[in-house]
Amino acid sequence: MEAGQLEKANRLIHETRVMTLAVCRNDIPWSSPVYFVFHDNGFYFFSNENSRHIKDAEGLNSVSASIFQDSDRMDLIFGFQMAGRIETISKMDVYLKVVKKYVSKFSFLKQIFGSQMIENRQFFLEKFKSRLYCFHPDRIYLSDNSNPSGKRSEIDITVIR
């Protein structure tokens, strides 16, 4: 990945707030937007365990996700198209690290609910009926309409920080 693309990819992951997850069960596709944070090569999000995208992802080896910057110019469309799997997060150390990042990225939550979001492990479950999940990408394609030599290329997630 070129240096300019790497910088744009880093900004995209850390500044974009919404990732769209897509699943398919019994030939019925479904997509859902979720707030996310990037940590340790994974995309973490909170969701209700009974939501359609979580229920439909159970037992699937592959789901898809995308993250794109918003633009009103076609030549500035830039983002990721991904395939991977969803995992429920239960390890306390991972949970605490991710919640701190989540609260930092979505600071309005801490302003509304205070420090209990970090201190109370059950906060998201009690308040929003949501659990922590991680989308682990197996394949990531960078889509960059500003690149004249090729609009789409597979990338290694480990280069993103």
Language-model regions, residue ranges each:
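Short, surface-exposed beta-edge/turn micro-motifs
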Residues: P33, N41-G42, L60, K129-S130, ...
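Charged, gly/pro-rich active-site loop segments
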Residues: F78-R161
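Short, surface-exposed beta-strand-loop junctions and turns on beta-sheet-rich folds
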Residues: S51-H53, D72, P148-G150
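Extreme N-terminal tail/first-helix region
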Residues: M1-V18, R161
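Short solvent-exposed loop/turn micro-motifs enriched in small/polar/acidic residues
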Residues: H14, I28-P29, L125-F128
